[in-house]
């Protein structure tokens, strides 16, 4: 199920579906939590998320999912979100990697998402090195 906001980012509405897409597309999940009565949320939607650079970065590296306060209260509680706007980044297994609260100018927002991406890559590399089964598969693949 998809919802289109006034920009080119495709916003999913199901976290489970976003995880499936992230896994099949080798991306991270960006979960955004907003409130219609929140000035910082509206500024984030109307300025930051409409920036070409932000749209391009999110589309390239993330599957985006959006939740609105009042409508998606269950998701706010599930993820422990009490302040808005909140941006959470998850790996394709649903592990939270990054959480930032508040308004960010476009360049700073891209920088923060880039940090989340690096953190996810570092975590994945660490897990890969620590998993003997994955190491054996990698060695076999390299020998082929």
Question: Whereabouts are the PLM-identified features?
Answer:
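Non-catalytic, surface beta->alpha helical segment in thiol-disulfide oxidoreductase systems
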Residues: 49-50, 82-123
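Detector for the c-type heme attachment site
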Residues: 42-46
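N-terminal leader/targeting and pre-domain segments
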Residues: 1-25, 118-139
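CheY-like receiver
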Residues: 18-21, 75, 112
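Short active-site neighborhood of thiol/selenol oxidoreductases, capturing the structured segment around
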Residues: 25-38
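Thiol-based oxidoreductase modules, predominantly thioredoxin-like and allied folds used
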Residues: 7-13, 33-35, 47-73
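Short amphipathic alpha-helix with an adjacent loop that forms part of the alpha/beta core around
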Residues: 77-79
């Amino acid at each position: 199920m998809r919802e289109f906001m006034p920009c080119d980012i495709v916003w999913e509405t199901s976290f489970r579906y976003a995880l499936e897409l992230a896994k099949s597309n080798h991306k991270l999940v960006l979960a955004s939590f907003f409130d219609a009565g929140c000035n910082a949320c509206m500024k984030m939607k109307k300025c930051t998320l409409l920036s070409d650079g932000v749209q391009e970065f999110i589309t390239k590296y993330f599957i985006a999912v959006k939740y609105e306060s009042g409508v998606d209260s269950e998701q706010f509680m599930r993820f422990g979100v009490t302040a808005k706007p909140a941006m959470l980044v998850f790996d394709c297994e649903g592990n939270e990697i990054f959480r930032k609260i508040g308004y960010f100018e476009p360049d700073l927002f891209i920088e923060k998402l880039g940090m989340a991406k690096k953190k996810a890559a570092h975590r994945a590399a660490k897990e890969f090195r620590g998993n003997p089964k994955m190491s054996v598969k990698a060695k076999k693949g390299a020998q082929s």
